[in-house]
């Protein structure tokens, strides 16, 4: 018997927070970490972080539970230019409960579309989230 894919809606206050985050003027790294409220079947805010490096962000993620992250990253280009790409990172660690993984996987695209993001990455181990990994991923876009 196969379970139908659950697609969770995005909480209204989170939609507004993501919209504001997209147009923020600050020049430091920042992150919005989101989780699924499985009773409400809603993607909700877990925590907001300011001035956080990829390595510090990694330390905030649970090792056995999925999370969605929207990360504003100060990207220093080789030619000296600076940009602030918004990255969507789906943290789906090995060892999560299968039903939890399916709920997050089923809701990922809706959240990406809601947040209007194009730089979408996935990690299967929170330890993979490093500055080097992120710069390598962003290198494909710049």
From Swiss-Prot:
Note the SS bond partners: none
Q: What are the protein's UniProt keywords?
A: Acetylation, Growth factor, Phosphoprotein
This chain belongs to which protein, by name? Glia maturation factor beta
What positions does the domain ADF-H occupy?
4-139
Under PANTHER family, the record lists:
GLIA MATURATION FACTOR BETA (PTHR11249:SF3), GLIAL FACTOR NATURATION FACTOR (PTHR11249)
Traced from the root, the source organism's taxonomic lineage reads: Eukaryota, Metazoa, Chordata, Craniata, Vertebrata
Query: What is the organism field in this record?
Result: Mus musculus
Instruction: Tell me, in a sentence or two, what this protein's role is.
Output: This protein causes differentiation of brain cells, stimulation of neural regeneration, and inhibition of proliferation of tumor cells.
Q: Quote the InterPro entries the UniProt record gives.
A: ADF-H (IPR002108), ADF-H/Gelsolin-like_dom_sf (IPR029006), GMF (IPR011171)
Record carries keyword Transcription: no
């Amino acid at each position: 018997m196969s379970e139908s894919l659950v697609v969770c809606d995005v909480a209204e206050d989170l939609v507004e927070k993501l919209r504001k985050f997209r147009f923020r003027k600050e020049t430091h790294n920042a992150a919005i970490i989101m989780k699924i409220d499985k009773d409400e079947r809603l993607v909700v805010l877990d925590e907001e972080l300011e001035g956080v490096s990829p390595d510090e962000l990694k330390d905030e993620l649970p090792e056995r539970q999925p999370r969605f992250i929207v990360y504003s990253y100060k990207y220093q280009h080789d030619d000296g230019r600076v940009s602030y790409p918004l990255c969507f990172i789906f943290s789906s660690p090995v060892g999560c409960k299968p039903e939890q993984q399916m709920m997050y996987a089923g809701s990922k695209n809706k959240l990406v579309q809601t947040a209007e993001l194009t730089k979408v990455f996935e990690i299967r181990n929170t330890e993979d989230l490093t500055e080097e990994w992120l710069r390598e991923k962003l290198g494909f876009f710049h």
